[in-house]
UniProtKB/Swiss-Prot annotation:
Residues 2-63 form the HTH asnC-type domain. GO terms for cellular component: cytosol. One of its GO terms (biological process) is response to amino acid. One of its GO terms (molecular function) is sequence-specific DNA binding. SUPFAM superfamilies: Dimeric alpha+beta barrel, Winged helix' DNA-binding domain. SMART domains: HTH_ASNC (SM00344). InterPro entries: ArsR-like_HTH, AsnC-type_HTH_dom, Dimeric_a/b-barrel, Tscrpt_reg_AsnC-like, Tscrpt_reg_AsnC/Lrp_C, WH-like_DNA-bd_sf, WH_DNA-bd_sf. This is Uncharacterized HTH-type transcriptional regulator PF1231.
């Protein structure tokens, strides 16, 4: 379980993942080794999944960000979700309740690539009954799971 110090360390890392342990330690008034040990423990326990740059795909040469709802044959949802999660174009994927079984966000460079993804990749996965694709025309917030 996370204590208040862990939560404060996470807060500062979420604000700027490049912030040094020594800077966080100085702000929090604890030794640098304390921050280092706690971050290492949170990585080991999967609380921190990884450190990565959060990019704007539109500025990085990608023109299409789409949300795809997927309907799957009964009893194949987990199997299909695992196969979809392996595809490079998939940024976020989750099994859902409600009208559709799976939702995913994909990023591709063009409409042609989106078509290839839908027909050549999704079309070959056994168990998918149907998909519904929505292309985002603009994005107002890029984020991450802010928990603190």
């Amino acid at each position: 379980m996370l204590d208040e110090l862990d939560k404060r360390i996470l807060y500062f890392l979420q604000e700027d993942g490049r912030r040094s342990y020594s800077e966080i330690a100085r702000i929090l008034g604890v030794p640098e080794s304390t921050v280092r040990v706690r971050v290492k423990k949170m990585l080991k326990n999967g609380i921190i999944r990884k450190f990565a740059a959060l990019i704007n795909p539109f500025k990085a040469g990608y023109e299409i960000v789409a949300v795809i709802a997927v309907d799957v044959e009964p009893n194949k949802v987990r199997e299909v979700a695992e196969k979809l999660a392996e595809l490079n174009e998939v940024d976020v994927l989750g099994i859902a309740t409600g009208a559709h079984d799976i939702f995913m966000q994909v990023t591709v460079k063009s409409l042609r690539e989106l078509e290839e993804f839908l027909l050549d990749k999704l079309g070959k996965i056994e168990g998918i009954k149907s998909t519904e694709t929505s292309i985002l025309t603009s994005v107002k917030k890029w984020g991450y799971a802010r928990v603190f």
